Amino acid sequence: MNIYKRLGIRTVINGNATLTRLGGSIMPPEVVAAMADASKHFVDIIELQKRVGEEIAKLTHNEAAYVSCGAAAALTLSTAACITGLDATKREKLPLHPSPGRGGFQPSTMKSEVIVHRHGRVGYDFAVRQVGVSFVEIGDENGTPPDELENAITEKTAAIFYFANPSREHLWVPYEQAISIAKKHDVPLIVDAAAQLPPPENLWRFTQMGADLALFSGGKGLHGPQSSGLIVGTKSLIEAIAFNGPPHPFIGRGMKVGKEELVGLLAAVEWYLGQDHEQLQQSYEDQVTYYTEVFKDIQGVTVHRSFPSEAGQPMPRTEIRFDAEELGITRDEILQQLQAGNPVIDIAGTGANGVLINGQTLRPGEVEIIAHRLKEILCSIDC
């Protein structure tokens, strides 16, 4: 029996995105097999982390790499690394707030600020703040002049963070200029690119531009273990990340990465880089064409190509708009009926009357299931 049936859990057809709440992505057999193989033996975790990092660094054309416990943990560990380096005394003082018996925060010796774009903030930046740093925001709705970034840098600046999203980047200091400013002041620049795969070139694009670190989710575009993340960048900062990370009893102790996840992410990177990404892109285009054909004769329904995808990735999605007055059913009622079925169908709403279907997370045959279920709902009203 399927484990989810035994537990009474409905499975989900995920036409939404590589969302954590839905399980991220589906691991290919190669990744599952690698994890199962890793589970059969005891190993030295520190040694395994080092070797896996070396292999991933080679695959991704980077100086060094580290496997974290998800992308949020990557944010925390990267911030910690920028503050402590390999200084054990500083490591003991994280997080940066008064703590009896730990020495507390000493502003004269500890960097405590991170620079971010005001219109680049995301809901996950708590993972940076939990180290105890404060954010210095730059820019506004009209953009960010480079000198504003430079003027924000002080002796307290630990790092400059970019939360990558191509749809917002016109409001930010361009990467190349920001990297030049950061290097001038010897401040690390870090790019959180958790969902920015595809394109696969992003695994080395940011660091080749000069970013000190780039962070990715292991369980989104890479199709690795959901509880894994990938950090690539300079050897010195990767060493400082490992210094703060598990199994050491400091700020990263609770962010453990098992031997299965370590080996699984290596297998995922190998698998991902071996895929035909042009063919995958074409398959997403074909889905838009398919839905357009399926719904072309249904009054009150229109289909459009939406681009880019939800986090600015260069992938098309299918946007379907519903005329509630003509159909006699609202978009939200349609979404509720999709959620009520078995399996659940989870797609994103957009605007007042539209939905978006993301092909990145659909398995073979599920495109047709979604189309059939939508037609079934619409035909129950008037067909």
Please place each PLM-identified region on the residue numbering.
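Conserved C-terminal alpha-helix-loop-beta "cap" of PLP-dependent enzymes
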Residues: 3, 294-372
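N-terminal alpha-helical segment of soluble enzymes
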Residues: 38-46
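Phosphate-binding loop/pocket of nucleotide- and phosphate-handling active sites
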Residues: 110, 382-383
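A common structural junction motif
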Residues: 248-249, 338-345, 375-382
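Glycine-rich phosphate/diphosphate-binding loops and the adjacent beta-loop-alpha structural elements
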Residues: 271-277, 355-356, 360
